[in-house]
C-alpha cells in the first residue's frame, strides 16, 4: 500500500479496459463484404463443421465471423452486417453475422427464437410446430 507522499509523486494508474470486439470501433454493428465463406472445425471436445466467413469491414478491419442457423445463402462479395459475440469453440471468431439483414437471408422454417435468426412468422392458420407439448 503506497504512502501519501508516494501517491503525490506518482498517482494511481487507471486500469485500461480492452475491447472484446475492437473491429466494431464503438459501434453496435458494422457492414462488410465477404471475402471468403468456408467451414472450419471446432476445438477439442467438440466435432462439427462450423460455417464462417472472412469479412472486410467498412472500418478497414478484416475479421472472421460466424454464420448462425441452419443453411445460408452467403458467398464471396455478399454484403453482410456483423455484431459482436464470440464463438467459444472457434478460436479467433469474435463476431456474428446478423441473419435477415442486407444480403443475408433469414433461417427457413424457424419457429423458436425467430428474431435472432431473421425468420418471418409462419402462416396464421398453421399450428405451431415447437418441441413442447401442452
From Swiss-Prot:
Domain of life per record: Bacteria
CDD domains reported in the protein's UniProt record: Ribosomal_S12
Gene3D superfamilies in UniProt: Nucleic acid-binding proteins
Low complexity composition-biased segments: 124-134
Biological process (GO), any one: translation
Keywords: Methylation, Ribonucleoprotein, Ribosomal protein, RNA-binding, rRNA-binding, tRNA-binding
GO MF annotations in UniProt: rRNA binding; structural constituent of ribosome; tRNA binding
Matching SUPFAM superfamilies: Nucleic acid-binding proteins (SSF50249)
GO cellular component: small ribosomal subunit
3-methylthioaspartic acid modification, residue list: 89
Disulfide bonds: none
Record region (Disordered): 109-134
Ranges of biased composition (kind: Basic residues): 111-123
Ribonucleoprotein among keywords: yes
Pfam family, one: Ribosom_S12_S23
Biological role stated in the UniProt entry: With S4 and S5 plays an important role in translational accuracy.
SUBUNIT field: Part of the 30S ribosomal subunit. Contacts proteins S8 and S17. May interact with IF1 in the 30S initiation complex.
Protein name stated in the entry: Small ribosomal subunit protein uS12
Organism whose genome encodes this protein: Wolinella succinogenes (strain ATCC 29543 / DSM 1740 / CCUG 13145 / JCM 31913 / LMG 7466 / NCTC 11488 / FDC 602W) (Vibrio succinogenes)
Amino acid at each position: 500500500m503506497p504512502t501519501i507522499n508516494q501517491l503525490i509523486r506518482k498517482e494511481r494508474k487507471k486500469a485500461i479496459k480492452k475491447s472484446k470486439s475492437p473491429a466494431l470501433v464503438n459501434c453496435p454493428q458494422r457492414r462488410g463484404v465477404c471475402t471468403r465463406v468456408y467451414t472450419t472445425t471446432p476445438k477439442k471436445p467438440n466435432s462439427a463443421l462450423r460455417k464462417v466467413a472472412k469479412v472486410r469491414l467498412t472500418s478497414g478491419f478484416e475479421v472472421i465471423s460466424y454464420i448462425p442457423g441452419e443453411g445460408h445463402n452467403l458467398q464471396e462479395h455478399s454484403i453482410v452486417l456483423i455484431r459482436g459475440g464470440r464463438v467459444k469453440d472457434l478460436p479467433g471468431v469474435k463476431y456474428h453475422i446478423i441473419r435477415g439483414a442486407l444480403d443475408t437471408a433469414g433461417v427457413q422454417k424457424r419457429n423458436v427464437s425467430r428474431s435472432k435468426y431473421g425468420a418471418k412468422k409462419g402462416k396464421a392458420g398453421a399450428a405451431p410446430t415447437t418441441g413442447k407439448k401442452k
